[in-house]
Amino acid sequence: SRFDGSYDQYFFPGNRGFHSLWGSRCFDYGKHEVLNFLLSNCKYWLEEFRFDGYRFDGITSMLYWDHGINKDFTEYSLYYDGNQDESAITYLALANRVIHQVDPEAITIAEDMSGMPGVASPIEDGGMGFDYRMNMGTPDYWIKLLKEKRDEEWHVGDLFYELTNKREEEHTISYAESHDQALVGDKTIFFRLVDKAIYSSMGVFDKNVIIDRGMSLHKMIRLVTIGTAADGYLNFMGNEWGHPEWIDFPREGNGWSYDHARRLWSLVDDENLRFRFLNMFDKAMIQMVNDTGVFHWRPEPLVRDNERQGLIFT
């Protein structure tokens, strides 16, 4: 940060150079030295370490001068009201150009909370050139549903709308949950479904309706998410088979402990536990997608019965 003794060689001067929530520095993407440094990094990791692509995390913070903090993007005018950092947008387009020139097979994915149009549109069409954007609304919707409604109250029409509410011209990565739900302080979907029963009733001979219900809903949530994904699907390690604990990397707040910096893969290998059934379902689900080419089609409803809560889509 103070390579030449100053605070703003590569960053904005003053308060603009500091992110108020993250405590990190903010690059001035209008400086040629910053562009050279960042673009050379994109090239370096592809060539030297054979990376197969990049996921650009939290680009909402880059796109807007206020970082999109405490802001709801409810209309298109909010994307183009002078609050956008055009230099950052230019850098993202240049980064995609460089990455795809160095390795045409490389994949780039953008995580943007605001939903800015054009993030995953071709540069030639005025977009930023990302191959995919994260479908951020889907995991939030599942968590909201699990928190606020019993499963018998779920409305299939609303569910289908939320899972397919994305721009057709931009490819998206859908997912039911990710690292955000698996880190300390949050709960995975399976833990929300079965709670403490996960520690005592996951044996193959245990009879527990909470576990039975939780496993069935866990499978259904993943199947309907991948079935409506259309472009791509994301999973986070261990979540596919209901790992019971969170991940917490060593930090000052936990006394630099490694106790939860792990995944207990022995659980899914234990034939006396039911975790393996969730894992078998996930493998079969992924194989089905590979065999049928689901991601080549957009889901369309064929039959919708709101009274009986029935939905058939293809």
At which residue positions do the language-model features occur?
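Alpha-helical packing segments of well-folded alpha/beta enzyme cores
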Residues: V34, L38-W45, Y91, A95, ...
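Substrate-binding/active-site clefts of carbohydrate-active enzymes
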Residues: S1-Q84
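Catalytic cores of secreted or luminal carbohydrate-active enzymes
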Residues: H260-V294
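Residue-level signal for pocket-adjacent positions within structured domains
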Residues: S6, W22-S24, G129, H179, ...
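Conserved alpha/beta catalytic core and glycan-binding cleft of carbohydrate-active enzymes
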Residues: R50-D52, N70-E252, Y258, N290-T314
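Short acidic-aromatic active-site loops that bind/stabilize oxyanions
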Residues: F27-K31, I211, E271-F275
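Short clusters of hydrophobic/aromatic residues that line enzyme substrate/ligand-binding pockets
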Residues: Y7-F11, F27, M134, V184, ...
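Tryptophan-centered motif/residue detector
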Residues: W22, W45, Y175, L264-L267
